A protein has these predicted regions:
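Classical Sec-dependent N-terminal signal peptides that target proteins to the secretory pathway
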Residues: 1-23
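Compact alpha-helical subdomains of small soluble proteins
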Residues: 76-147
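Stable alpha-helical elements in mature extracytoplasmic
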Residues: 24, 43-50, 133-136
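Short N-terminal segments immediately surrounding and downstream of signal-peptide cleavage
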Residues: 21-41
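Short N-proximal segments of mature Sec-exported proteins
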Residues: 36-92
Length: 147
């Protein structure tokens, strides 16, 4: 009987530990592979997600590079505004409702980036490198390229 309890305890602990190690956000690369980029909902989520990662990047570089931090926060706000515009057009939401929803979602995604960035920092002393966060940044940078 003690062996069964011990085995159960070990299994439960390993499940908990694996859950605690999991990233809070799914990689944008994986997300976009599973979604249709032509759909408004996918575009809206992508804009919110990119807004969150630029806000996160702004906070990371704030002390070392105030100019880049300011640029990142401007990009973040522009992406969030574009998501609000799409929500008003595609989902027929009122402007105030769309703004509130977009800001709430960005805060959630931003918090996830903070938590995952801290985990990555503990692992390899980088907020971005070696994690999905750097891949997300590359994807999001393509949205802001000037043609």
């Amino acid at each position: 009987m003690k062996k069964i309890k011990l085995i159960f305890l070990i299994i439960a602990m390993s499940i908990y530990i694996n859950y605690a190690k999991a990233d809070l956000n799914t990689s944008l690369k994986i997300y976009l592979e599973e979604k249709n980029l032509e759909e408004g909902a996918t575009q809206i989520y992508l804009l919110k997600r990119c807004s969150a990662i630029y806000a996160y990047a702004s906070g990371i570089v704030l002390k070392s590079d105030a100019v880049s931090s300011k640029n990142f926060i401007e990009i973040s706000n522009n992406l969030l505004f574009k998501s609000v515009e799409l929500m008003v057009i595609d989902e027929s939401k009122k402007l105030e409702e769309a703004q509130e929803e977009a800001e709430t979602k960005r805060k959630e995604l931003f918090s996830n980036y903070i938590a995952d960035g801290k985990k990555n920092w503990e692992k390899n002393k980088s907020h971005f490198k070696g994690s999905y966060i750097s891949e997300d940044m590359v994807i999001c940078s393509k949205l802001t390229e000037e043609n």
